[in-house]
Amino acid sequence: MRSSAASDVYKRQDIANASSLHSLRYADSDAPLNTEYQLRSINAVIDEVITDPVLAKVLVGNLPLYAAEKDKTPFSTHAFIMDFYNQSAFRVRGGSDSIATALVDTINRYGGEVLTRQKVTRIVCDDTHAVGVEVDGGEMLPCDIVISDAHPMRTLELLDTRLIRPAFRRRINHIPQTVGGFSVYLHFKENTVPYLNYNYYGYQGDTPWDCERYTEQSWPKGFLYMHFCPETDTPYASTGVILSYMQMADVEQWKGTAPGRRGQAYEDFKRRKAERLLDVLEEHFPGIRSGIQNYYTSTPLTYLDYTGTEGGSMYGNARDIGLGSAGRVPQRTRIPNLYLTGQNINSHGMLGVLVGTVVTCSELLTAKTIYEQIKKAGE
């Protein structure tokens, strides 16, 4: 068992290290990476190198981090994300919003300005380039370069120009999406729930796979439970979250309604799902209910309305070995000064946001310059 696990670890490390983006070693191309591991599924590779069936399931126990699907998600996605988490900090003290705050502070320090509560309603183009963005259907903000981290489908909806070919729009609109999520955000009673410095992945069946395929009776088939890292050293958690897969179809009837105004039936639906998820958590952590002061929830509709991600998906576009290049979204567009970034152009989740940013910025500053700056900042 030990040698099998080591084989999986070494294979993941080799694939991650072969990428100049993940290793921050500049190379003209990542030819070794464009091989079988982008074309073979996670389960196919693991079943090949892991002989113990229980160990094979353990190694993919954190599937909710990237919503992998059996026979579809490439092993390279698993390798990059696992290597990223193995090498990085696993929690952000005080919550992840501190990352956004630090980014805003940096932008301000360099003379930039961050505008909030101003919705971009159109990317304005002339015959050859993007010339600015329209905000709230009125104000025009001139731009030399436009970078969009919105879902690619949302970005295309902002473009009324012949510079984007209909074939490209059709291809982007037909890329499958990852599954949505139902979250229960927990507020614990003070000094009641011991802080967990790890994520907990719970499953009601004997496999982490196929949790996105459920019925009303079988939901939830799996869940992720974690505590948010407190700002001060304390043995107790103040907040946490439970996350389980949820298809957009479950909340489709309320699509088009406004947040906070979806009606009592929607509130009853969320409460029923939350209570069921809490019942499952109680089975894994007996007594946890007594430590919860209150909770609130989110559904795929929440993701759709607040982030614009298609279908309320957690991680945007799905990676599918069956699609090949048709399932990839480039950072460049046919509009020379319009770029895409974020989790849809490279990888999923937090890793996708980080590497998507590097890939897009490399178009403006070169990859070599970006890698050198990152390395210097880490010295």
Language-model-derived ranges and their functions:
Residues 1-13:
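Single conserved hydrophobic/aromatic residue that forms the stacking wall/gate
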Residues 343-364:
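A conserved FAD-binding loop/helix module that cradles the flavin
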Residues 54-66, 283-347:
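A glycine-rich dinucleotide-binding beta-alpha-beta segment and adjacent secondary-structure elements
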Residues 91, 121-235:
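Mid-domain catalytic core of redox enzymes
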Residues 79-130:
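Helical element adjacent to the flavin cofactor pocket in flavoenzyme catalytic cores
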Residues 191-298:
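C-terminal segments that line or cap access tunnels to active or ligand-binding sites in enzymes
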Residues 125, 366-379:
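Active-site-proximal substrate-binding core of FAD-dependent oxidoreductases
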